UniProtKB/Swiss-Prot annotation:
Protein name listed in UniProt: Phosphate acetyltransferase
Catalysed reactions, semicolon-separated: acetyl-CoA + phosphate = acetyl phosphate + CoA
Keyword flag Cytoplasm: yes
GO cellular component assignments: cytoplasm
EC number: 2.3.1.8
Subcellular location(s) of the protein: Cytoplasm
UniProt record, GO biological process: acetyl-CoA biosynthetic process
The protein's annotated pathway: Metabolic intermediate biosynthesis; acetyl-CoA biosynthesis; acetyl-CoA from acetate: step 2/2
Family label: Belongs to the phosphate acetyltransferase and butyryltransferase family.
Keywords: Acyltransferase, Cytoplasm, Transferase
Keyword DNA damage in record: no
Gene3D superfamilies: Isopropylmalate Dehydrogenase (3.40.718.10)
A GO MF term: phosphate acetyltransferase activity
Annotated organism of origin: Rhizobium meliloti
């Protein structure tokens, strides 16, 4: 989503710097056939965040590069006839172990995710696939996660458990410590009239019983008392999360999408995007994303891949 370069180093800049200290993540880029997607992959590679393998019609990639003066250098290109074939081949390369990350190019999100979700040939795991917005909100101290605002439309309790765990795992993997997680609803009291409040309470109990690990959960919380200390104090809510939430878990996709876009367009927040729960992290970018937001998406995914790589080495 849109943003502007700030005058001072931002939360994104710190994430990008941390990722540059790691080895580049081999990234399968599906159909980068416009200036934005191809240029973003090349710039991320030049910054040392990723090593891209470009999967698309080779002639189209070379035409885009020539038209926009993008230096392909010696980048590996896997030639396929069209965008659908690019999505299928990109997923196949991940299954073959060729890449640590999957990155969306200029094809439609649904086209890529259809291949990712395929039962026999996709990238599903036992965990539910979910999306996280990694937000840099001007004037807000912490990086802010919003989930799920792009994949799961009306998630049930079991899906929400995975959505929460995916977000916690990402927060920890990119080196931000133990997150404070707010399960959002319209109110902060449990009421049968608002089902999301009951699910919020259940998720908190699941965390108490070890069914969700790695974060501190509180809910239900309304948005104001999740992120504003004074609002939490007025409501008499005393917890480590209230007023200090770092991960916001929304009731459904509509609420999450509106929240993320409100922050983007009213506060000029940046919103990097990542899909988790598949075999590898998936970088989902929008045509409206700024260069820095695209780099931040790659950086977060690369940090996640680096932590997984380190864990695999330690396990040997």
């Amino acid at each position: 989503m849109r943003x502007r370069w700030p005058a001072q180093p931002s939360k994104y800049d710190r994430l990008i710097a941390a990722a540059r200290a790691e080895a580049p993540a081999v990234t399968i880029v599906a159909h980068p056939c416009d200036e934005t997607s191809l240029g973003g992959a090349i710039e991320a590679a030049e910054m040392g965040l990723i090593t891209p393998i470009l999967v698309a019609p080779e002639a189209k990639i070379r035409n885009v590069a020539a038209e926009h003066r993008l230096d392909l250098g010696r980048r590996e290109i896997v030639d396929v006839p069209h965008s659908h074939a690019a999505a299928a081949k990109a997923v196949a390369l991940i299954r073959e172990g060729r890449g640590e990350l999957l990155m969306k190019g200029s094809l439609h999100t649904d086209e890529l995710m259809h291949e990712v979700a395929a039962s026999a040939t996709g990238l599903r795991t036992q965990r539910r696939i979910s999306h996280v917005f990694v937000m840099d909100v001007p004037g807000h101290t912490d990086t802010l996660f919003i989930t799920d605002a792009a994949i799961n439309i009306f998630p049930d309790l079991e899906a929400k458990r995975d959505i929460v765990q995916n977000a916690i795992d990402l927060w920890v993997a990119i080196g931000l410590g133990e997150p404070r997680v707010a399960i959002l609803s319209a109110v902060e009291t449990v009421t049968a009239k608002i089902p999301s409040t009951i699910e919020a309470a259940a998720l908190c109990k699941m965390a108490e019983r070890g069914q969700i690990t790695g974060g501190v959960l509180e809910g239900p919380l309304a948005f104001d008392n999740a992120i504003d200390q004074e609002a939490a104090r007025i409501k008499g809510i005393n917890s480590p999360v209230a007023g200090h939430a770092q991960i916001l878990v929304v009731p459904d996709l509509e609420a999450g999408n509106m929240l993320a876009k409100n922050l983007t367009f009213l506060t000029h927040a940046d919103a990097a995007g990542l899909v988790l729960g598949a075999r590898v992290p998936i970088v989902l970018t929008s045509r409206a994303d700024s260069v820095r937001t695209r780099l931040a998406s790659c950086a977060v995914a690369a940090l996640y891949a680096a932590r997984r790589r380190a864990a695999q080495v330690a396990a040997v």
